[in-house]
């Protein structure tokens, strides 16, 4: 029974995906994922990224957010991307493949960042979904906590943070932790985010720790 449900769910996702306006637009514009439009919308509202900035993109593969970020920072800026999964090269993006929970990978990431710290940390990370809230939500919250921890390690004073969070158990506590670390925190639901998804984006500015 559960196998049939998964198949039906997968089929629905495939139909939605290929009939999706943003998927078609991404293909037309040469963007690697529809997620790129989410960052474009956040940028339009909150002006997170400016020319010359240094940006860290966590969970970067397949590279939609990095494509947007590298155009925004321009030739004088820097984008450092990290993911467990491989990612095809993007001109101007310094990509590190690995799990930044591992000491060796974290050290390599921090070396790339250098002593100057970064202006923006981005995280569009999400776990592989099992379909069980009791499993998926804790995994999702663990990833956003890792992203906030990365802010504490690399973000410059008054820096910014944009992170995908799934509403559910642990969300309120996480929001409180982000508000303690940043002067201003806004919740965004981009138009390009699927309506039935519980995902929202926290946009935090004015890092104060």
Curated annotation (Swiss-Prot):
Record-linked InterPro entries: RNA_methyltr_RlmE, RNA_MeTrfase_FtsJ_dom, rRNA-MeTfrase_E, SAM-dependent_MTases_sf
Keyword Chaperone (UniProt): no
Keywords: Cytoplasm, Methyltransferase, rRNA processing, S-adenosyl-L-methionine, Transferase
GO molecular function, one term: rRNA (uridine-2'-O-)-methyltransferase activity
Name of the protein in question: Ribosomal RNA large subunit methyltransferase E
Pfam families: FtsJ
Enzyme class: transferase
HAMAP family: RNA_methyltr_E (MF_01547)
UniProt EC number: 2.1.1.166
Cysteine pairs bridged by disulfides in the record: none
Cited function: Specifically methylates the uridine in position 2552 of 23S rRNA at the 2'-O position of the ribose in the fully assembled 50S ribosomal subunit.
Active site: 164 (proton acceptor)
GO cellular component assignments: cytoplasm
Primary location group: cytoplasm
Family the UniProt entry places it in: Belongs to the class I-like SAM-binding methyltransferase superfamily. RNA methyltransferase RlmE family.
Annotated source species: Shewanella sp. (strain W3-18-1)
Catalytically driven reaction(s): uridine(2552) in 23S rRNA + S-adenosyl-L-methionine = 2'-O-methyluridine(2552) in 23S rRNA + S-adenosyl-L-homocysteine + H(+)
Higher taxonomy: Bacteria, Pseudomonadati, Pseudomonadota, Gammaproteobacteria, Alteromonadales
Amino acids binding S-adenosyl-L-methionine: 63, 65, 83, 99, 124
Localization in the cell: Cytoplasm
């Amino acid at each position: 029974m559960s196998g049939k449900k998964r198949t039906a769910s997968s089929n629905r996702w495939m139909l939605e995906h290929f009939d999706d306006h943003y998927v078609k637009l991404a293909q037309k514009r040469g963007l690697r994922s529809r997620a790129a439009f989410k960052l474009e919308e956040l940028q339009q509202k909150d002006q997170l990224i400016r020319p010359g900035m240094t940006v860290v993109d966590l969970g970067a593969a397949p590279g939609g957010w990095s494509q947007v970020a590298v155009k925004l920072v321009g030739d004088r800026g820097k984008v450092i991307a990290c993911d467990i999964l491989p990612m095809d090269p993007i001109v101007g993006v310094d990509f590190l493949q690995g799990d930044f929970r591992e000491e060796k990978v974290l050290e390599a990431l921090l070396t790339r960042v250098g002593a100057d710290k970064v202006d923006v940390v981005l995280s569009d990370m999400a776990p592989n979904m099992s379909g069980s809230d009791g499993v998926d939500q804790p995994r999702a919250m663990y990833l956003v906590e890792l992203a906030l921890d990365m802010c504490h390690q690399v973000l410059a004073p008054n820096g910014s943070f944009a992170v995908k969070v799934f509403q559910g158990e642990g969300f309120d506590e996480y929001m409180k932790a982000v508000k303690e670390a940043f002067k201003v925190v806004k919740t965004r639901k981009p138009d390009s985010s699927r309506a039935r998804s519980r995902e929202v984006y926290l946009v935090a500015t004015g890092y104060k720790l």
